[in-house]
Curated annotation (Swiss-Prot):
Any one Gene Ontology cellular component term annotated for this protein: Slx1-Slx4 complex
Coiled-coil ranges per UniProt: none
Organism whose genome encodes this protein: Candida tropicalis (strain ATCC MYA-3404 / T1) (Yeast)
GO biological process: DNA recombination; DNA repair; DNA replication
Protein name listed in UniProt: Structure-specific endonuclease subunit SLX4 1
Pfam family, one: Slx4
InterPro entries recorded: Slx4_ascomycetes, Structure-sp_endonuc_su_Slx4
Post-translational modification: Phosphorylated in response to DNA damage.
Segments of skewed composition (Basic residues): 79-92
Region of interest: Disordered: 1-116, 337-369
Low complexity composition-biased segments: 36-46
Amino acid sequence: MSPEGEESHAEDNLYFHNTQMQSIHEETLAEESHAQSIQRSISRLSSFKHEDTDSESPIPVQKVIRHIKKTNTNTNTTKTKKRKLKVSKPRKNMSSSESVRQMYGSRKNGEQQGSIDGFLMSRFGDVDGCNESDRSSKLISQGEWESLSKFHEESNEKDKLLRKKIQRYYSEPQEELGEGCGMLSQASADPETKMTKEELESLYDLDSSTVFNQTTISAIGDMSEPTQVSEPCVVILSQTKVQSEASTQEDGADASVQEIKSSVPTQELFSTPEFVPAPLEQPVNKEVCSDQSIVVLEENVQSTQADDSDIVELISDSDPEPEEVSTKVQVLRSIYDSSGPVNDKQPSVASETVESDSTPIVSPVKTPQGTRMHVVQVASSNPSSPIKIVEENTEQQEEVFTDVESIYSTARTSFGTPKHTSPVILLESSDTDCDDNDNDVEPLSSMPMVKTVPKKRMRTTVLQVSAALKVQNYTDEKNNIKLRKIGDDIPVEVPTKDVEYEEIPDSQESVGGEGDNSVSIIEITREVHNNDYTGDESTDLFQVGLNKQDTCEDTSSPVVQIGGVENDILDSSLIEPVPEPESVPVPEEVQEQPQPTAIDKHTATQLREKFQLWGLKPVRGKEKMVEILQGISNFILPEHELLAVADKQELQSCIFMKLDAVIREGRAMYDRILSFEPIRIEELQMMLQSQDYYLELDVLRLYCDSSGITTTNA
């Protein structure tokens, strides 16, 4: 080969080697970066590793030393510091091929991969080498899974067999016991089987030594001392009864063995008054009862507190004096507590009677004595009528009822028309009669007993009619109503008192002359029931008016008609016209009293229930409730349909439909509502009153809210 050919061949080889070295160097850099990323991930996962120092040795971790260069911050210093220069070894120039050879020959990456494989093998085991003989692997093989599942099924079957054996043991009757078991165990095994007479006799013939030899008695304090029997042991044998018979016995009667001390001290729990129990007859062949007794004081204390009355009373009696009550003989009953069944027979009163040594008890309740005057204020508004209300002196009148019937209940009224006060009702009460049956047995109590008497609330009304009437005395015992005429046909003078009274003006019928003395005074007494009387309304006066009657030929003789009450107490048979010597001028036209409507016939309690049913605002007084319902009835015609309304929604729908039609007739108010102008509810009420429609403000407010009408209070 020529020298030129050799040179060209050498150049080609050099180029080839250079490119080969460059590629190897690039691959080495890539492997090194990959190894560094793996090392970083391993260092992060090492914090979650559970190290076991006993079984495994820690994996060595290469330490990386970083040299931190310190910069001199104090540049502006007066003194210059000498720097210690570190002598560094001169670096040896190394070619790229040699550096590649060193990196490739050290095989650092291979060592790191081997350490990682060793860690994984130690933790999770070798999957390929897993077999039944090598149990070092933590992976469970298929055979192990199958054995575990079979063991679970077998254990369930064993549990089922065990349960069946237990149930069969308790359900099936036990076989006869063999030798070595006594009759007590046989009796407890089958309690329903009764023992024979010979077996019972053999049990009772047992010696006490046999009983004590079979039992072990030891002292609690010292277990090393020999057993000693200080007290005799009494054993009571009882045959267990059937469930139906055993259920009738008490809880303490089913004990088969009881240990009873020979002497039990008697403890008296009730020390005052002194009491010595009488000896009781001990039953023969019964369970021994203990002598411990409890003394119980029997007292039937009767409450003497009076019932709360519906009427507020202002009692003007003097302070009651303390009243001494005589002591009575108190009976003490002894109840003996025993573990056995309690004897139903109680000791007689005669055998155990003691006298109480306690001091007399002063009762805070004063027994009613004499006459007490109770003043009750009743609010009423009396309209102008031809009847004068005359105040009558109650001392000159006779009793309406007897003392027994009128205790705390008889009412007398004397009506007047004071200027700033309401009419006054005087309630009179008297002492109760003594009970004639003194020999009757009274309940044992140290408190005074007050005999309860049913209360009656009576109302007496005095009417003065400016006409001559012939009234027959009338008494209705069933309804407790009494009517009579007082005095002659002359006016009764009103007694002068310190209080100024305002006289009720007379009507047109009484205008006949100042010297006309043709008047009639009628007194009506009736019973007021609780449902007819409330504190919010006045039931003092009847609705009295003058009407013409077709049966009377003489129109100058008026007839009194009383209405507005369920039981009419006057009719045409009781009141007859009386001819007068002189004619009384009567006006041509007489205003007639309106007949009572269906709403007026209802009581205040019934109307209050209607208000609550319809959701109306509750008001005080029957007259106010009737007035509100009459205003609502104008929107619901006829009136009987108002009382037939079932609920609140039906009533509101009927009122609101008629109210819409009434408002649309008045164009002024209707235009304001259409323009969303705020209106006052009082203005709407005044507009309706101008058209003879009367509704309360709460009903109008509900109408505005349901219809979306804007309202204001300004």
